[in-house]
Each structure stands twice: as C-alpha cells, then as structure tokens.
Regions:
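Gly/Gly-Pro- and Ser/Thr-rich, intrinsically disordered tail segments characteristic of DNA damage-repair
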Residues: 1-288, 295-298, 443-501
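DNA-contacting surface of Y-family translesion DNA polymerases
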Residues: 2, 9, 241, 247-417
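Core structural elements
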Residues: 153-156, 347-362, 424-432
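Short, hydrophobic beta-strand segments
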Residues: 156-162, 384-391, 435-441
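Non-catalytic surface loops within mature trypsin-like serine protease
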Residues: 162, 196, 357, 392, ...
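A short glycine-rich, hydrophobically flanked beta-strand micro-motif that places a catalytic Asp/Glu
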Residues: 190-194, 349-353, 419-421
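Short conserved micro-motifs at the rims of enzyme active sites and ligand-binding pockets
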Residues: 363-367, 433-437, 481
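C-terminal hydrophobic structural anchor segments
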Residues: 405-461
Length: 501
C-alpha cells in the first residue's frame, strides 16, 4: 500500500480586490471595493469583490449593476437609521441624505448612520500577474517547483508529503508559515485546505474553511481526510459547492433522488451501472469523489496532455453589434488566431465559430426563431454555430480570415444583433512547412505570405501588438487596438478607480 500523502490547496482571498486595496494602502479585509471596468456599462462583470462588500450579499462575480442595486438597498435601510438618530441632513429638495459616507467596514459598523460607499477599481491584469509571480516565489522558498501545481492566478496545489519531516512541522504549521509570509510580503490574506488527496484539500479550502472562524489576519485553514469528509460533508448542500460538480450534473443526479454526496455514495453501492449509463466514463470520477477518493496525484496532473489540441479566442462585446460590424470583429479575431498559430509554429485543420445574439432581439418583440436560456435565465435567440474545414492544415491569414468571414455570413441571421463571439482553431499540429498544392497553386505567394506574417509578428513582439495594424482596426466598432492592450480580455493597467456612494 502506498504511503498516505498530504496536499495543500491555497487560495488568495479576493485576490484582485486585495491587490487594489493594498496598492491604495487600505486594509483588504475592511475596505469596500469592486474590481470592474466601469468605462464599459453597468452590465460588466465584477472580477472581484472585497470581503467586507461580500458581507452585504454581493457575490464575487456579480454584474456591476447588481452591486450598485444592492448598495442602494443597503443605503435605503441605513438612511432610515440616520433619520431616526437625527444624523441625516435634509436637502433643498426636502429629501433626507447622509451627512457622511464611508467605504471602511469598521467605520460603518461603528456608526449605522453612515452611508455605505465603495471604490470601483479598473482591472490591472499585468499588476495581478506580477503579484501572483511574487507569491509563487514565496512558495518556492519552501517547496520544489515539481511539487506545486498553479491551478489559477490565485490558487495553487502543493504536495507537502516529503517536506513535513524535513521541516519538523505538521501540515497545518507549514501551511500557516507560508500563508503568513505571503501576508507579510504582500498584505494579502489566504485560505488553505489540507487533505489526504487533491480533491479533499480543495474541499477543505472551498467548503470547510468558510465555516470556521478566521484568525486576526483573516486566515482560515481546514483539514479533511476520507473519514472526516464523510462525517462533515456527506450531508452538505448544494452539490454545486463540490469541485467539478456543475449544475448540469446536479440536475441529472436530482432526477434520481440524489441531493448530497452521501446520497451518491449510497446509490453507487447498488446503482453503479445506472450511473455509468447516465454519465459514461465520468461516473468513475463522481463515485470516487462521493467516497472521498482521488487517485490522481501531482505527477499525474503535471503530465496530463489533452487528446486533442485547439486554440480559441472569445469576447463579449460591450454593446449589441449589427451583423456587419460583428463580421469585422470576426475578421479581427481570426487575425489574432493567425498570429498565435504563427508564433507557436502550429497549423489548424478547421475553424469553428459560435455567435451569441443579444437579448434585445427577443425583448423588442417580433422574433419568432429558436431560443435558448442564458446563464442568467434570460431568453435569447439560439446561438449560431458552424465549422469550416480546410483542404490542408494552415495558419495563413488569407485562409483563416476570409474563411471565417464566409462562415459568419453563412451561419448568422443578418437581422439580429450580436453580443458574443468565440472562434476556435481545431486540431492544431506542428507546422511542418508543407502545402497542399495543385497545378494552379502559387507556392511562392504562399511562402511570401508566411514570411510576411512572421515579420509582422516580430515587429509586434518588439514594439507592441499595436505597432502593426490593418486599416480596418481603425473602423468604428473595431476592438483589436483595445484588446491588444488587455490581458485575458481585461485591462492590463488602469487608473486609481472611482469612489461610489
């Protein structure tokens, strides 16, 4: 029997919001702040919400308008308190207003008559990457890179099995040591989970740690093994709180009377075959997780390679785009794919395009086509979807851009406005330098185009992505210039933010 291993999962608390608070010399735990690009619209997603603002039941990935509305509701209640305490002021319009507001939780808790305010900080993705790198280097002071798996910009898994006897520490002590050093160096608090496998470490962090008191610095550390997992979490609801258990899976489980992990474990004793009928090979993962098992360790997840490779570009447009303007965006996105393939020396066999329509097409009335429900429960026209396959794998812009535009024309309804576009380069493989040719193929022209792409890529890498642009990128509605200044679809750097009352 293999020796029991010990894993840590560490998550930086409200990471983007915490970075913004620390850079403003504000306490991340008591400052009301959201990270969102208010220059777009109030429909924009909040990338992060500070812990003190989450306390007002504002979710971490709310739309900005949802945060604005919730703050209005809170302030309506607080204003009544201010009026009763004779601390509100009456304006010339005869209405009462707050005499003062604050974005600090301590001040707001001390004086219920204060108005709730908050800071809207524009995202600065490059800054977050820099801080994440700094924190990763802190972990490397204690463990080898071979024993760390960065799960995201703000979350890591660490196999600490061999380090506990070396440092003469328990897993809790080592986790606290690393978390404390991160806090000292960056001002950012973290939550940690300890488990006998990766799955249990993740659940200890995601679920159990949230229900235990934090220390004076806001740090929470929880532990799980297979037995404590069954005792603490077999009756936990909802199932969507569990790692890798999405809403679709939960709906199918509930049809069979399965509402908890305990239900699933008991069902699997006699109903294993039925689970495989419903979920296929994914049933194995569900059953293992129901019992608290996870066979994959650090070596397995680091060596994993997907069976097929693809490269994708996607964006949600800031407003509804008419069909002709949306086609311009598709051409720009295909060009970005071209440069990504060229840089990685890859070619693709086909392009898949998915176009999501705006809900205004339904709201205005008159639309009678197929519909679907978006993630917010709203009715929208059914998305357009299509694929174009090439005669031979390619990364040439003349093919990718023109064929993507033709595909867009073929699959979309020109009468509908567009809000979301995703384009995928499928089955990418190394570029061997070969062309599919016939008597009419001008191979010199193809080679010239490839060299031009490589030259343009070199200029972009040296002088910036906007150093070489097509004239179409200066047309109204084009987004290439803006997106070239972004990281992950969000601003790489921004202003200091605005105070909202």
């Amino acid at each position: 029997m293999a020796a029991q291993r010990t894993y840590l999962a560490i998550d930086l608390k409200s990471f983007y919001a915490s970075v913004e608070c620390v850079d403003r010399h504000l306490d991340p735990l008591t400052t009301n702040l959201v990270v969102a690009d208010a220059s777009r619209t109030e429909k924009t997603i909040c990338l992060a919400v500070s812990p003190s603002l989450k306390a007002y039941k504002i979710p971490g990935r709310a739309r900005l308008f949802e945060a604005v509305q919730r703050v209005k509701e809170v302030n309506a209640q607080r204003l009544q308190t201010a009026i009763r305490r004779h601390k509100a002021v009456r304006g010339e319009d005869g209405k009462y207003h707050f005499a003062s507001t604050s974005f600090d939780a301590n001040a707001l808790n001390a004086d219920p008559a204060l108005g709730l305010s908050y800071i809207v900080a524009p995202p600065r993705m490059q800054r977050y990457l820099d801080v994440s790198t700094q924190i990763y280097k802190t972990y490397l002071k204690y463990v080898s890179p071979a024993d760390i798996y960065p799960y995201s910009i703000d979350e890591v898994f660490i196999d600490v099995t061999g380090y506990l006897p070396y440092y003469h520490m328990s897993a809790h002590e080592l986790a606290m040591t690393m978390v404390r050093e991160v806090l000292y160096n960056t001002g950012i608090t973290a939550t940690a989970g300890i488990g006998t496998n990766l799955y249990l470490a993740k659940l200890a962090m995601d679920i159990v740690a949230k229900h235990i008191p934090a220390d004076k610095d806001g740090v929470r550390i929880a532990e799980l093994d297979e037995q404590s997992y069954r005792y603490l979490l077999w009756s936990h609801r909802p199932l969507t709180d569990f790692w890798m258990t999405g809403p679709g899976t939960v709906k199918r489980l509930e049809v069979h009377g399965i509402y908890t992990m305990g239900d699933l474990a008991r069902f699997s004793i006699h109903g294993e075959d039925r689970l495989y009928e419903i979920f296929g090979v994914d049933a194995e993962i569900l059953i293992d997780h129901a019992w608290g098992y996870e066979p994959c360790g650090m070596a397995e997840i680091k060596s994993y390679k997907p069976s097929t490779n693809s490269i994708s570009e996607g964006q949600v447009l800031t407003c509804p785009y008419p069909n002709d303007k949306a086609k311009l965006i598709v051409r720009e996105m295909a060009e970005i794919l071209m440069f990504r393939l060229t840089e990685k020396k890859l070619v693709t066999e086909s392009i898949t395009l998915e176009v999501g329509y705006d809900r205004e097409n339904v709201d205005k009335g008159g639309y009678r086509g197929l519909t679907q429900t978006d993630r917010y429960g709203r009715i929208i026209p059914k998305a357009a979807h299509g694929t174009v396959r090439f005669d031979a794998p390619t990364n040439l812009g003349s093919t990718l851009i023109n064929e993507s535009a033709k595909l867009f024309e073929r699959i979309t309804d020109p009468a509908l406005t567009v809000r979301r576009i995703t384009i995928n380069a499928n089955k990418v493989t190394p570029d061997e330098g070969f062309y599919q040719v016939d008597f009419f193929t001008d191979t010199r022209k193809l080679e010239k185009e490839k060299k031009l792409q490589q030259a343009m890529l070199g200029i972009k890498n040296k002088y910036g992505k906007n150093a070489v642009l097509k004239a179409s990128s200066y047309e109204e509605g084009a987004t290439m210039r803006q997106r070239n200044a972004q990281i992950g679809g969000h601003s790489a750097g921004g202003s200091d933010g605005k105070l909202q009352k």
